[in-house]
Amino acid sequence: MTKYIFVTGGVVSSLGKGIVAASLGRLLKNRGLNVTIQKFDPYINVDPGTMNPYQHGEVFVTDDGTETDLDLGHYERFIDNNLNKYSNVTTGKIYSEVLEKERHGDYLGATVQVIPHITGMIKEKIMRAGKTLGADFVITEIGGTVGDIESQPFLEAIRQMKAEVGDENVVYIHTTLVPYLHAAHEMKTKPTQHSVRELRSIGIQPNILVVRTEAPITDDMRKKIALFCDVDPSAVVESMDVPTIYSIPLRLQDQGLDQIVLDHFGVQAPKADMTAWAQMVDHMQHLSRTIKIALVGKYVALHDAYISVAEALQHAGYPVDANIDLQMIDAEKITDDNVQDVLGSADGIIVPGGFGDRGIEGMITAIKYAREQDVPFLGICLGMQVASIEFARDVLGYADANSTEMNPDTSHKIIDLMADQADVHEMGGTQRLGLYPCKLKAGSRAAAAYDNQEMIQERHRHRYEFNNQYRDEMTAKGLVFSGTSPDDHLVEVIELPEKKFFVAAQYHPEFLSRPNRPEGLFRDFVAAASREVKD
């Protein structure tokens, strides 16, 4: 029988529910158990694909092409499993599917209601997540905060799950806050008590409380929380701020979180061997060097807009014993006059993905600087397209070279709309999304990054592509097209082999990076940047 673990949050948002879910997933996986994780987001958007990065942060893409919440990136990095479309579900998705079934007559004329139809669809998504990925344990994070009107259908659905599959197959974990009042020099448990009372009022009694704190909670405080919230004192687990999120599984294991969960389920499993993970975390906290990487982007005011890029860079720093000092540079503020001042101290330059024409000229200036000054450079998605435009302008001499996304009337369409996108008018879920094969050129930097494999699989999110009319001309000037689709039609990777490192990919390599297994392009880019550090 599949076991279900539900993670809710109270008091305030951003308590780290996703990291708690991911950490528990890691602990259970290291016990030899099959685990998957999913998140329910209570907003009306069908998916986050069309949402403003400043509001939502990064859009994470799964193998099957689903545009998801950034928490799925954390899930994949922690449990090292690739997730799918059942791993992120929104209110909008649930309602759209229910309404579609109603239009098809599937409900046989019944009055369609939140209960049972919406809650039934939610439960179906929960169960299907485990079935499609062959998981024995499904960890489900409920987005938002208990008490929010938007979350009520999800909370009602997970309440019903206990009756449907049995108490012995369901665990409720509630994350909450124990704030420290500096003026009074005192920690307060009342917000946690009220949050649990709110959860209990809708029929959910948490089995475990994970309390976010600035300082350790005392035994007396633990007993007080347990008494008022009707849980065992051992099930009050503290989650303090830590230097790296990857240490949280170790902190939770020390407090027996995974064992408490398994005891409730009556499941016997070997203790999680976290030796390799602990060694990795120890290494992360004792890095001897610092590498300065300039990220030139459009959404730099919000770090979460590039969270997977930032994580992939940190992962790539570990093999060279280096911490990454990531300098977020607003592309709009880069000009020919100040580029040296802005980027002169960087050991490497990265231009990540994005959409629209804002900041494009600054990105072109930054890439020109990297190419001419031989600063290690990595371009991703839009970064690859802009690198192609820069080469056309400054090497081929086509001053007005551009992408038709930025300038439909350009006479040199270096980047153009993909043929199968010409008749697409919907914005959401219509790009080239998900895992696609990429053929690598033998002897190239790209091939070396992937251990000289001939074919790799990478995740994409774009609707524009390189215009093959310019391929021969650029090749003659030294640009190498080192990665293409298997039929050689779509350009996937470009590089300048004579440079220390100048590689750009149409796909998103950051989505497949892991803390214990850095992604190849990021690894080699950071290694090249490490050789630029002035010790």
Curated annotation (Swiss-Prot):
Q: CDD domains given for it? A: CTPS_N, GATase1_CTP_Synthase
According to the entry, every stretch annotated as the Glutamine amidotransferase type-1 domain falls at: 292-535
Q: Which GO terms describe its molecular function?
A: ATP binding; CTP synthase activity; glutaminase activity; identical protein binding; metal ion binding
Q: Does the keyword Nucleus apply?
A: no
> Does the keyword section mention ATP-binding?
yes
Q: Which HAMAP family match?
A: PyrG
State the similarity comment: Belongs to the CTP synthase family.
This chain belongs to the protein called CTP synthase
Organism of origin: Levilactobacillus brevis (strain ATCC 367 / BCRC 12310 / CIP 105137 / JCM 1170 / LMG 11437 / NCIMB 947 / NCTC 947) (Lactobacillus brevis)
Gene symbol here is pyrG
